A protein has these predicted regions:
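Beta-strand-centric surfaces of beta-sandwich/beta-rich domains
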Residues: 23-549
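Bacterial N-terminal signal peptides
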Residues: 6-17
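Positively charged n-region of N-terminal signal peptides that target proteins for export
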Residues: 1-5
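Signal peptide processing junction and immediate N-terminal pro/mature segment
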Residues: 18-22
């Protein structure tokens, strides 16, 4: 053991409680509420009884035809032009994400209509080409985008009911082609328990909401392009060397929240980054709730602290890539929650503790770590809110599609289990790495998420691997809440985080990804069983063991 840092501070926080009991009344969740939570992360530990789900065009046969399996198409009649219903759900709730596969002139006649609270007039009624337009549409870039895939992450809250449908005047007439609906539709939404008050979206937004929209768009642009500001003074800043088998241990006493953490490891080789284990224990519990190799927590296990690579799968910048040329990219990346620079990796996951915390970094590799630097910023609190969970990170690694692999769906497709837990908590994201030294595609598998449920199908069923990472068509781009570290060939490493659309659970959660490649990729998965590695980020109360491999 190299060092042990005791807590050096104690800050008293005075809580002013209104005499009228207003502290028991949560704020109404309106557009500004959801926008603010798209650019901040301090709310992530909050647990509640909401339920996040998805309505999509996933293939109900269990195959890979996920583009056009529409679930509720109303045929035209003499009195009605017909419609394609994408979502029909009761409130209170909020739509967080709407994705579509392609936008071409073939879809020019298709309109999207969104009705709130059983209103006779839709709040949005416009061509889908306009709805997803990141220059002249209703939402600003980067809250709407068409990088590798058209979509919007603009919140649409509703109090009582929400209906999302497609209409087209040519539907049912001679020459009609279902391709006019487009394909690979996904609508992600959350429903809240009845005590939660949600104010339905009003359009156009008022001046205050316009400021919130602009602030959120700017915050996302900054989050995807630069690292967060450092605190005026770090709570702890330690540097040491670590021989194989040795550890750095940092102890914190009392109550607080780790707001930011930065780690630098030299040499930043795959052996060292995969062999350096980070463990965090909360509130005096002996078993770690965070138990992950440093390189797989931050995603740079195979790429180090910012190196250059080339791939046909990289989409950089605002506009979609045309064709498939090789693109040079750096594995240094930035996001709202994690990032890697040329010198270090950083995390902004809030990590609360009520009765101390112990962070251990152990060198399990066979090489000497010449320099390990750890810095973190802690905010002291008098006590934690009762509804806060503790941060957890679970790392697992296994070969794909073996006899021991779990399987789901009508065709028993093998899956990688990212997280499977019982209790009360909240799943907020993943870092995924696939061992893939090939140019061809690896990710036709759908993401499936069960929360407080066990039957088939799950309430969240995606349409492919890359869509879960807000990307598409076998390529990846970078956003504030999702993106890539590395791409094929090599060790494609991609991440996705959930803010408003986090998956709360009261009894259990299961997160899996189908292992399906398509064409030569399918043969590789079935015959060579490449490694699938994941780090799941989640919160829980009470504290649980990470359960890592």
């Amino acid at each position: 053991m190299i060092g042990r840092l005791a807590a050096l501070w104690l800050t008293l926080v005075v809580l002013v409680v209104p005499a009228n009991g207003a502290q028991d009344q949560p704020p109404e969740r309106d557009l500004s509420f959801f926008l603010h939570r798209l650019r901040t992360v301090d709310h992530l530990p909050e647990l509640e009884a909401s339920h996040t789900a998805m309505s999509s065009t996933w293939d109900r046969s269990g195959g890979n035809a996920d583009g056009t399996d529409f679930k509720n198409v109303v045929q035209p009649t003499a009195r009605s032009p017909g419609r394609n219903i994408l979502l029909d759900t009761a409130g209170p709730g909020c739509i967080h994400r709407i994705f579509v596969g392609v936008l071409t002139e073939r879809q020019a006649g298709t309109r999207i209509q969104i009705f709130l609270d059983h209103g006779q007039k839709p709040i949005f009624d416009m061509p889908i080409l306009e709805f997803f337009n990141d220059s002249n549409g209703p939402f600003p870039y980067p809250l709407v985008f068409h990088k590798s895939y058209p979509g919007t992450l603009f919140p649409i809250p509703f109090a009582k009911h929400c209906l999302v449908q497609l209409v087209n005047d040519r539907f049912g007439k001679p020459g009609w082609n279902d391709a006019a609906w487009s394909n690979y539709w996904q609508v992600t939404y959350t429903r809240y328990p009845d005590p939660v008050k949600v104010k339905s979206l009003v359009w156009p937004p008022d001046d205050g909401e316009k400021k919130e929209i602009a602030a959120t768009a700017q915050a996302w642009l900054e989050a995807e392009s630069k690292q967060p500001n450092e605190p005026a003074k770090w709570t702890a800043d330690q540097t040491t060397a670590l021989e194989p088998g040795k550890s750095m241990v940092v102890d914190l006493a009392g109550v607080g929240v780790i707001r930011q953490m930065r780690i630098s490891v030299e040499p930043d080789t795959p052996e060292v980054l995969r062999g350096t284990r980070m463990q965090i224990r909360w509130d005096g519990i002996d078993t770690p709730s965070v138990d992950v190799p440093v390189g797989h927590f931050f995603g740079h296990a195979y790429s180090g602290q910012g190196r250059w690579f080339t791939s046909t799968a990289a989409v950089l910048g605002k506009k979609p890539l045309k064709g498939g040329p090789y693109v040079d990219y750096t594995s240094a990346y930035n996001s709202l929650l994690l990032g890697v620079t040329s010198k270090e990796a950083y995390s902004r996951f809030p990590m609360p503790f009520a009765n101390g915390a112990t962070l251990t970094i152990r060198n399990r590799s066979g090489s000497r770590i010449g320099k390990l630097r750890l810095r973190f910023d802690v905010e002291r609190l008098a006590q934690l809110p009762a509804n806060w969970g503790r941060f957890h990170a679970t790392w697992t690694e296994s070969p794909a599609a073996t006899d021991k692999s779990p399987a789901t769906g009508p065709k028993n497709v093998p899956v990688k289990t990212v997280l499977q837990k019982e209790g009360r908590g909240k799943y907020v994201g993943v870092m995924l790495t696939v061992d893939w030294p090939y140019e061809f595609w690896w990710g036709e598998g759908d993401w499936q998420i069960w929360t407080d449920e066990s039957g088939w199908p799950p309430s969240y069923h995606g349409t492919g691997s890359e869509e879960y990472f807000n990307s598409g068509w076998c390529r990846f781009d970078r956003k504030a809440v999702s993106g890539f570290v590395m791409l094929r060939p090599g060790h494609p490493t991609v991440y996705s985080f959930h803010l408003n659309d986090a998956f709360q659970f009261q009894r259990n959660v299961r997160v899996v990804e189908e292992q399906m490649g398509g064409g030569p990729g399918e043969r590789v998965i079935r015959e060579r069983h490449p490694l699938w590695t994941s780090t799941a980020y989640w919160y829980a109360n009470p504290v649980q063991p990470a359960g890592s491999d």
